[in-house]
Curated annotation (Swiss-Prot):
<dbReference type="GO" id="GO:0022625">
    <property type="term" value="C:cytosolic large ribosomal subunit"/>
</dbReference>
<dbReference type="InterPro" id="IPR001063">
    <property type="entry name" value="Ribosomal_uL22"/>
</dbReference>
<keyword id="KW-0689">Ribosomal protein</keyword>
<dbReference type="Pfam" id="PF00237">
    <property type="entry name" value="Ribosomal_L22"/>
</dbReference>
<dbReference type="InterPro" id="IPR005721">
    <property type="entry name" value="Ribosomal_uL22_euk/arc"/>
</dbReference>
<comment type="subunit">
    <text>Part of the 50S ribosomal subunit.</text>
</comment>
<keyword id="KW-0699">rRNA-binding</keyword>
<dbReference type="GO" id="GO:0002181">
    <property type="term" value="P:cytoplasmic translation"/>
</dbReference>
<dbReference type="GO" id="GO:0003735">
    <property type="term" value="F:structural constituent of ribosome"/>
</dbReference>
<keyword id="KW-0694">RNA-binding</keyword>
<keyword id="KW-0687">Ribonucleoprotein</keyword>
<protein>
    <recommendedName>
        <fullName>Large ribosomal subunit protein uL22</fullName>
    </recommendedName>
</protein>
<dbReference type="InterPro" id="IPR036394">
    <property type="entry name" value="Ribosomal_uL22_sf"/>
</dbReference>
<dbReference type="GO" id="GO:0019843">
    <property type="term" value="F:rRNA binding"/>
</dbReference>
<comment type="function">
    <text>This protein binds specifically to 23S rRNA. It makes multiple contacts with different domains of the 23S rRNA in the assembled 50S subunit and ribosome.</text>
</comment>
<comment type="function">
    <text>The globular domain of the protein is located near the polypeptide exit tunnel on the outside of the subunit, while an extended beta-hairpin is found that lines the wall of the exit tunnel in the center of the 70S ribosome.</text>
</comment>
<comment type="similarity">
    <text>Belongs to the universal ribosomal protein uL22 family.</text>
</comment>
Length: 151
């Protein structure tokens, strides 16, 4: 039996939450995107994610910097398009949840955002002489909590 844990942070007052479980995206890209968006107004975060998908804005990397090239005006950074599409879905979902709860969607601020390692899919590829090579894929859980605040 799997006992599901809730969100990793509980907030008092008016807030909205959203979560994506077991997304097939890179953990390293997701951690860096979440770090960059934390504390940002939701409208600005959506603009940044759209620009990353169009490859006009690079996400600055603060972790997993090995062989990450510098981008103009950013430092080490990349354009993680696949992870950005998952974050776009997450941001739209939390905005709809906030609208349903009656919050003012123009003043939403990202209070908490996290990317955590989820379930691992184990695959084995047959090789020569009866051996098998392991191919493990980590799935990622994303969560976000927004509150009403001033920009």
């Amino acid at each position: 039996m799997i006992i599901m844990k809730g969100y990793s942070m509980e907030i008092e007052g008016n807030h909205a939450k959203a979560r994506i479980r077991e997304a097939d995206i890179s953990l390293k890209d997701s951690v860096n995107i979440a770090h960059h968006l934390r504390g940002m107004p939701l409208s600005r975060a959506k603009e940044i994610i759209d620009a990353v998908i169009n490859k006009t804005y690079a996400i600055p990397y603060f972790r997993y910097l090995d062989s990450v090239s510098h981008r103009p005006g950013v430092g080490p950074g990349r354009y993680p398009v696949k992870a950005a599409k998952a974050f776009k879905q997450l941001l739209e979902n939390v905005e709809n949840n906030a609208e349903f709860k009656g919050l003012n969607t123009d003043n939403l601020v990202i209070k908490h955002i996290a990317a955590n390692k989820g379930r691992m899919i184990k695959k084995y590829t047959p090789k020569a002489y009866g051996r098998a090579g392991a191919n493990f894929k980590d799935l990622i859980n994303l969560e976000i909590i927004v509150t009403e605040g001033s920009e």
